[in-house]
């Protein structure tokens, strides 16, 4: 039973399908970020139909005034959502997205767990991780779809790091390349999760290096120290390779990352840390002067407390278990030349889980305020993503009896359901609600945008929804003819009886270039709202506005291309070296 990979994949996919069955009866859960993602997916699909493969400007945000949403928000989630919208009715896209992403998360956990656990235990870990309470909370209360997708990368992160630690699992430089690819995927999926993943990678690498140093000291004491391609890697080498993977990963993601970093000065990025979404406002059981915030915080805090309790149980009862002996022939079992090495996986999982739990508590506030960029994770309970990797792996090690495992799962699920009913029931959008959203995109009405993507010093709350696309100045009204009004290009003609300024229904973002009668023209902007103001002369004026390719985007594309070529070259070289006879005198790169 369940002895072949296909049957296990069917079980995992089926379990994830069961988890979203409420979608079939009640519609789509309309969590905190539901409209943000749905409108993004719909607009991306619309821009694809205009021939824009990689959108940068969300033209329909702020009711048609636009924002640079797709320049700053990582592309993987909105690409997947738009692709699903291209082949499925919009009313079923959220459910399909959640099912695919939960299944991917479970598959990545199975890939990790199978290295140390028998197939039945690995399948349990995969299903538990895919459907852990925090993932379900994201699906039904938060609709943080990009964050949910990032959860699929966390087991792969640990797997890549352990491959650096266990040279026989995959020789050569390929583990470093796999790690760089995972880190690049993190940047392209969700920025707060990418910060969390990089901090996790750094911390886990330091622990691995310490374990390697302890193994080396133990080998010295026993007279067994022998550094070779088949021995434990030197701690410094592990640190260097992780650093190289981080650099290469950032290089691969530079086509998104460099413009997002460089053009932050053109928006008010401080809005992402406004009151209510700051770390200090979102520690477990924290209350502020916002009843809605407090109810949701109580819900997520209750779920987190239950999961922390389960983690402590799993850590305590798995402390004497040898990970490698659970699955004969796995890398740990083959390479466990010392007790420290045999328990490396357990130590990493324990440290990762405990540190994740601590970072959700207010006692860690000084870390959030002083560690570079950590505060841009916004909400500390995002560390539940990492904590659940540890819990999913440690629980089958601690509880060998299926009754204990199922009881633990039942208690956690009951906690989520009861806390949800008591503190904050989920909201639901029916097919008619999603149809209204789709109509707002189709007819050009647009939607409410996000404050953090509005050009700096501009006030989106003062916008006039009834403003025409182009408005003339004082005096005689000019004759205006719209020729093109697309997401990345606007073109119109104006016949004016006197020189005047035109106001365009468009934020004056620096990437917009304006050409009047074939000549580049410097623009101004309106007070308060910051709309584009174009000076024109009397007579006929042909005006062309286009979203230009800035130098930072060009450099980002070049860096990504160079990084990709480097990755392919090094991968091919490592692949050739893997088939060469080992040199007993060498030490590997």
Spans of features found by a protein language model:
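A generic short-segment signal for beta-strand/edge and adjacent turn/coil regions
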Residues: 9, 48-49, 128-130, 353-357, ...
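Extracytoplasmic
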Residues: 107, 399-400, 408-499, 503-509, ...
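Contiguous hydrophobic segments
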Residues: 146, 272-277, 288, 444-478, ...
């Amino acid at each position: 039973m369940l002895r072949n990979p296909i049957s296990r994949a069917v079980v995992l996919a089926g379990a994830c399908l069961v988890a979203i069955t409420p979608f079939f009866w009640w519609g789509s859960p309309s969590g905190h970020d539901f409209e943000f993602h749905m409108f993004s997916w719909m607009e991306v699909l619309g821009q694809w139909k205009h021939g824009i493969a990689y959108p940068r400007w969300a033209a329909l945000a702020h009711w048609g005034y636009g924002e640079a949403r797709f320049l700053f928000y990582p592309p993987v989630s909105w690409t997947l959502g738009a692709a699903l919208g291209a082949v499925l009715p919009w009313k079923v896209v959220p459910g399909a997205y959640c099912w695919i992403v939960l299944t991917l998360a479970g598959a990545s956990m199975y890939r990790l767990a199978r290295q140390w656990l028998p197939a039945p235990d690995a399948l349990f870990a995969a299903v538990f991780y895919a459907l852990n309470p925090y993932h379900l909370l994201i699906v039904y209360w938060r609709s943080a779809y990009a964050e949910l997708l990032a959860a699929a990368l966390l087991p792969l992160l640990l797997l890549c790091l352990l491959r650096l630690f266990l040279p026989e699992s995959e020789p050569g430089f390929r583990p470093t390349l796999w790690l760089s690819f995972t880190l690049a995927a993190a940047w392209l999926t969700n920025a707060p999760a990418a910060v969390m993943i990089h901090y996790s990678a750094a911390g886990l690498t330091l622990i691995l290096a310490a374990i390697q140093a302890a193994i080396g000291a133990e080998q010295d004491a026993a007279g067994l120290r022998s550094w070779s391609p088949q021995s434990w890697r030197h701690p410094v080498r592990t640190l260097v390779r992780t650093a190289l993977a981080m650099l290469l990963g950032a290089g691969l993601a530079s086509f998104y990352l460099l413009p997002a970093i460089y053009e932050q000065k053109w928006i008010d990025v401080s809005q992402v840390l406004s009151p209510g979404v700051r770390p200090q406002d979102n520690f477990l059981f924290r209350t502020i002067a916002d009843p809605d915030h407090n109810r949701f915080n109580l819900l997520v805090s209750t779920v987190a407390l239950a999961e922390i309790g389960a983690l402590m149980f799993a850590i305590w009862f798995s402390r004497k278990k040898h990970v490698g002996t659970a699955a004969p022939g796995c890398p740990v079992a083959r390479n466990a030349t010392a007790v420290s090495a045999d328990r490396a996986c357990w130590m990493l999982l324990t440290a990762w889980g405990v540190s994740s739990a601590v970072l959700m508590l207010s006692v860690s506030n000084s870390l959030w305020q002083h560690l570079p960029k950590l505060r841009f994770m916004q909400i500390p309970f995002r560390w539940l993503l990492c904590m659940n990797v540890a819990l999913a792996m440690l629980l089958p090690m601690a509880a060998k009896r299926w009754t204990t495992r199922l009881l633990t799962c039942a208690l956690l699920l009951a906690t989520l359901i009861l806390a949800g009913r008591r503190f904050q029931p989920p909201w639901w959008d029916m097919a008619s609600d999603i149809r209204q959203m789709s109509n707002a995109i189709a007819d050009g009405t647009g939607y409410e945008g996000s404050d953090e993507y509005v050009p700096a010093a501009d006030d989106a709350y003062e916008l006039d929804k009834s403003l025409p696309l182009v408005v003339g100045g004082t005096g005689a009204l000019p004759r205006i003819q719209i020729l093109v009004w697309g997401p990345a290009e606007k073109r119109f003609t104006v016949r004016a009886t006197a020189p005047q300024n035109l106001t365009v229904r468009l934020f004056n973002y620096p990437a917009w270039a304006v050409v009047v009668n074939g000549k580049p023209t410097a623009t101004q902007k309106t007070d308060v709202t910051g709309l584009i103001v174009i000076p024109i002369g009397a007579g006929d004026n042909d005006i062309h506005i286009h979203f230009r390719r800035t130098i930072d985007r060009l450099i980002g594309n070049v860096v990504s291309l160079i990084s990709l070529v480097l990755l392919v070259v090094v991968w091919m070289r490592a692949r050739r070296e893997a088939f060469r006879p080992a040199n007993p005198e060498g030490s590997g790169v």
